[in-house]
Swiss-Prot record:
The modification N6-biotinyllysine is found at K695. Mn(2+) 1 binds at E306, E320. GO terms for cellular component: mitochondrial matrix; mitochondrion. Residues 653-729 form the Biotinyl-binding domain. In leaves, cotyledons and stems. Biotin-attachment subunit of the 3-methylcrotonyl-CoA carboxylase, an enzyme that catalyzes the conversion of 3-methylcrotonyl-CoA to 3-methylglutaconyl-CoA, a critical step for leucine and isovaleric acid catabolism. It catalyses: 3-methylbut-2-enoyl-CoA + hydrogencarbonate + ATP = 3-methyl-(2E)-glutaconyl-CoA + ADP + phosphate + H(+). Gene3D superfamilies: 2.40.50.100, ATP-grasp fold, B domain. One of its GO terms (biological process) is L-leucine catabolic process. This is Methylcrotonoyl-CoA carboxylase subunit alpha, mitochondrial.
Amino acid sequence: MASLALLRRTTLSHSHVRARAFSEGKSSNRHRIEKILVANRGEIACRITRTARRLGIQTVAVYSDADRDSLHVATADEAIRIGPPPARLSYLNGASIVDAAIRSGAQAIHPGYGFLSESADFAKLCEESGLTFIGPPASAIRDMGDKSASKRIMGAAGVPLVPGYHGYDQDIEKMKLEADRIGYPVLIKPTHGGGGKGMRIVHTPDEFVESFLAAQREAAASFGVNTILLEKYITRPRHIEVQIFGDKHGNVLHLYERDCSVQRRHQKIIEEAPAPNISADFRAQLGVAAVSAAKAVNYYNAGTVEFIVDTVSDEFYFMEMNTRLQVEHPVTEMIVGQDLVEWQILVANGEALPLSQSQVPLSGHAFEARIYAENVQKGFLPATGVLHHYHVPVSSAVRVETGVKEGDKVSMHYDPMIAKLVVWGENRAAALVKLKDSLSKFQVAGLPTNVNFLQKLANHRAFAIGNVETHFIDNYKEDLFVDANNSVSVKEAYEAARLNASLVAACLIEKEHFILARNPPGGSSLLPIWYSSPPFRIHHQAKRRMELEWDNEYGSGSSKIMKLTITYQPDGRYLIETEQNGSPVLEVKSTYVKDNYFRVEAAGVINDVNVAVYSKDQIRHIHIWQGSCHHYFREKLGLELSEDEESQHKPKVETSANPQGTVVAPMAGLVVKVLVENKTRVEEGQPVLVLEAMKMEHVVKAPSSGYVHGLQLMVGEQVSDGSVLFSVKDQ
């Protein structure tokens, strides 16, 4: 049974049940979709293209100038430019996208998720232009996409709602009064869109105005609509959503629920299906409520009804309905063995749903972990950079949805998600084992990611037993985040880094030896002395020094220099010493296998090691993956010396520090607001600038009271990560 279920999952796209238990009506083959334009980018565009190709349907990609060489462009049958990088001029330009579809001869447009996927105006424009919109009717998008309107509809239908304000009057004084009526803390949320963009938790009236205005700006930038709703903030909630599907013959069913409680910045980072620790009766209630919600607006195609579950009272409340395919839809596909994109196309073609409710299977358990380019230590701020090394694990029960390849750049213009790692197991425990193993094998070098943090989440004892809620990260922050004041943790971190630094040294030198042994350099004096007569000098214990700079997350983002002395032994082993009192000499045997792979023996343990290296700005950047550990080191180029070589320069990696009061950009981004003028007096914590990157705003505040100096930025300027923005001085 399990093997059959696994076969169904791994061939989602090859074999599907076709039991027509629902009313079907008449459908004509004369208008079947043969060519689809995918109005999106990244992993979801690649995902849609993959299913379309299997069905024999041609695909058209659209791209901005920033995405000309992207994977979603390369995988489509053809691609059409729609504008410059800013989303409002390209992926949010509905007229340009419809024009591209007509020019390409496509009969249908698939919006993916985000961008125009929940725009009723865009769905209507498609239909008016003679194009099939692969999604719900514009009326349902309008009713349910507007979170205030959807709550009014659900309230009228008797669905429980969280206390809040969902009215049309957006006057800020009115909103302040409503917030007072609801009672703090309140949740500020845009009425359109999703993904946590624009959401703010406000704890006191003093914070309200600034948070409200920032939420409006983010909503306008992300969704083109800046209206806001208010809700009472439930202190211990779970986020559980139900996947629903309808067809144009009046049939609606659900495909069970997903738990999306583990979030940061109000964005999901680990999702799972089915939800853990709920009863069959509770599951049934959720399903019935979700189907009723969909039927209330004559819904068809894919949708998700989101509920907030109060873990104190065990009551659930309607939160919102997403009228599109969700980012996390793969976990549902894994437990029901169906391709939801194929279902979307079937429904768009006028066909009935391929299964009835009683035929929908529920097999095993699935997790999805979202891999983001972000700085966890900086509060999960988005990061940019080049994927110099990118290796993902894939197997019969492990699936990776991605829109990038090695060498691609993650830019500031779009969402920083690199990939979705999806795993399946026969039960939750088995799936969790695969999730932890796959995360340990997920390799990215070139920019910071949240992979290490996801590993901490997956390995946490509370997560293992399914004790999840939306405050999971805050509740267990002492376990999940580093504490520079914890001497035990600091020592453990240093010892792990020291071990991996030693393995790095042995692996890099062994690879050089391997290459030079097969390509003798002819005694070049430019090479280290122990390679002047390959393989090595007989009876000469050549030594080599290396200095590696380790990014020490246990030291508040500071780095630590590790000075290594490597001695080659006649038996092919390396003795590696670290210049620190009490550090033992480590004996390492390294065997180069191929590419980035090594087989290493150290401290009585033999295991596989992966080392990725790239050079930039006269620095060699080195990443090592060993077991569940990943470490990142930097080395100045040209600093490797043999003991026999004379050098006037002692190896040294410089680190720069800015003067006290200097404020640097926490991320690469766009200046969207300058709140004070240069040489103005500010108070500690006063907002000075607002930066935007990947549709998220970040307020830059004064670090102390004083006068602003060096503030020369203007709205519309781009700043790089770490660049100096201004300083605050006493005078």
